[in-house]
């Protein structure tokens, strides 16, 4: 490996140390309903985002809360010497993409059938540390 390539790889590795992510695949909720909850926590600090999700009455908020806790644990595993409160973690990015669709048929009048689409989604949460983000800018 060349010197330049090694330097860029090390720089990328250091940049990735300040972020952590978690993924939830094939969650049996429609993407539209999940995006309503995801928009509430996008850009929020982690503590505030957890409170928003805990006190939300939507079913999607329970799944997002578990995913956010998983992302926090991933960050703690990456940064064993770092302190969670001092790092100032926030929800840097949250993506809700459409997942697999189960297609079912429901009988309709006059011998026809209507297609029922049971939608699912994929959610990705990326956490970033405020201290590192501001020092790099």
Curated annotation (Swiss-Prot):
Q: Which Gene3D superfamilies match?
A: Ribosomal protein L22/L17 (3.90.470.10)
What GO CC terms are in its UniProt record? Answer: cytosolic large ribosomal subunit
Enumerate the Gene Ontology biological process terms: translation
**GO molecular function terms attached to this record:** rRNA binding; structural constituent of ribosome
Q: Does the keyword rRNA-binding apply?
A: yes
Organism domain of life = Bacteria
Keyword terms = Ribonucleoprotein, Ribosomal protein, RNA-binding, rRNA-binding
Indicate yes or no for the key word rRNA-binding. Answer: yes
The record's listing under Pfam families reads: Ribosomal_L22
HAMAP family attached to this UniProt entry: Ribosomal_uL22_B (MF_01331_B)
The protein's role, per its UniProt record: This protein binds specifically to 23S rRNA; its binding is stimulated by other ribosomal proteins, e.g. L4, L17, and L20. It is important during the early stages of 50S assembly. It makes multiple contacts with different domains of the 23S rRNA in the assembled 50S subunit and ribosome. The globular domain of the protein is located near the polypeptide exit tunnel on the outside of the subunit, while an extended beta-hairpin is found that lines the wall of the exit tunnel in the center of the 70S ribosome.
Regarding protein family, the annotation reads: Belongs to the universal ribosomal protein uL22 family.
Q: How does it assemble?
A: Part of the 50S ribosomal subunit.
| Record's protein name | Large ribosomal subunit protein uL22
């Amino acid at each position: 490996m060349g010197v330049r390539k090694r330097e860029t790889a090390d720089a990328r590795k250091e940049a990735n140390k300040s972020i952590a992510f978690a993924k939830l695949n094939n969650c049996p909720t429609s993407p539209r309903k999940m995006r309503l909850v995801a928009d509430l926590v996008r850009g929020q600090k982690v503590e505030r985002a957890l409170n928003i999700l805990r006190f939300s009455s939507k079913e999607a908020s329970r799944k997002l809360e578990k995913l956010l806790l998983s992302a926090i644990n991933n960050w703690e595993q990456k940064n064993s010497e770092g302190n969670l409160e001092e790092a100032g973690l926030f929800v840097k990015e949250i993506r809700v993409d459409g997942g697999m669709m189960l297609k079912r048929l429901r009988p309709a009048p006059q011998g026809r059938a209507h297609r029922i689409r049971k939608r699912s989604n994929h959610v990705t949460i990326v956490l970033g540390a405020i201290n590192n983000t501001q020092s790099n800018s």
